[in-house]
Amino acid sequence: MKIKIAARGSKLSLKQVSMFTSYLLKFFPDLEYEVITVKTTGDKANAPFEELAKRGLTGLFEKEVNKAVLEGKADVAVHSLKDLPTELDPRLEIAAFLPRDPPYDVLISRAGNYDIFDLPKGSVVGTSSARRKALIKNLRPDLVVKDLRGNVDTRLEKLRRGEYDAIVLAEAGVSRLGLNVDYVRLDWRLFPPSPGQGIIVAVTRKGSEISDLLKSISDVKSEKLATAERTVLKEFGGGCFVALGAIAFEEGSLIRLRATVLSPSGRERVDVELIGKGPEEVGMRAAERLKALNPMKTTVGSEE
């Protein structure tokens, strides 16, 4: 059996495809595959993400990749789960969740191993994520937050050139690329990650042969935790453009979920933490609590 795998052409995306195929071949060593790279709207966009979101261009990094699956040009699309909207095309589904890599955000600074609280006043910190921007402003209103675009290598080069004093990235991306950089992991209680961060997923056509195949090897723990986190996002509203963080952990047979929503300025912040049995149930309860306590309106900004 041979399958065609669609993904973005970035170094990180192709590394994620490599991780997916390695995982797949553990179960199906005779499987053959072909990788199809797709140039996406998000890759080609030059405008700030907030502006793109206002135009309704959500799902910037997955739309054309999934289109290849819908059109039959590929059997599977490989994504970082945090880039996927909570609502997929009804003809598609997430068939497999890989074991989770570290879900946390990290701070990389020019001056050394600084935590966010160690940065000097007025330091310029780079990110284009609404969640990260709001969290930085909440924790350190004396810092300057500046948009940061490009792939991981480009972002690190901009840091080295002195355009920023520090940048915030997903630890999973840094780890997957095997980058030799010093960083400080940000406390998830203060700096909660994007829902689903650290998880690679495979999207397929519903009811397809490959969908059934992948479901048989999906990581149960990853799927459970991702479902809890993404249910908060879905029920609260706003997709991957809302300033919302969530992280879930297994505690025996239960799930502990912490979720945070912030105003764009970071001045208003609501944190909730709940324990429940079912991932959807605990996610829905967390979203309801956030809605009840939320005194502000949220805004847009990419999670890439």
Swiss-Prot record:
Cofactor binding, per record: Binds 1 dipyrromethane group covalently.
Annotated positions of the S-(dipyrrolylmethanemethyl)cysteine modification: 240
Uppermost EC category: transferase
GO BP field: protoporphyrinogen IX biosynthetic process
Enzyme Commission numbers on file: 2.5.1.61
Pfam family, one: Porphobil_deamC
The keyword Transferase appears for this protein: yes
GO molecular function, one term: hydroxymethylbilane synthase activity
Pathway field: Porphyrin-containing compound metabolism; protoporphyrin-IX biosynthesis; coproporphyrinogen-III from 5-aminolevulinate: step 2/4
GO cellular component terms, semicolon-separated: cytoplasm
Key words, A-Z: Porphyrin biosynthesis, Transferase
Cofactor: dipyrromethane
UniProt xrefs under Gene3D superfamilies: Periplasmic binding protein-like II, Porphobilinogen deaminase, C-terminal domain
Reactions this protein catalyses: 4 porphobilinogen + H2O = hydroxymethylbilane + 4 NH4(+)
Function: Tetrapolymerization of the monopyrrole PBG into the hydroxymethylbilane pre-uroporphyrinogen in several discrete steps.
HAMAP family for the chain: Porphobil_deam
NCBIfam families, per database record: hemC
Note: The porphobilinogen subunits are added to the dipyrromethane group.
Family: Belongs to the HMBS family.
Protein name in the entry: Probable porphobilinogen deaminase
Species of origin: Ignicoccus hospitalis (strain KIN4/I / DSM 18386 / JCM 14125)
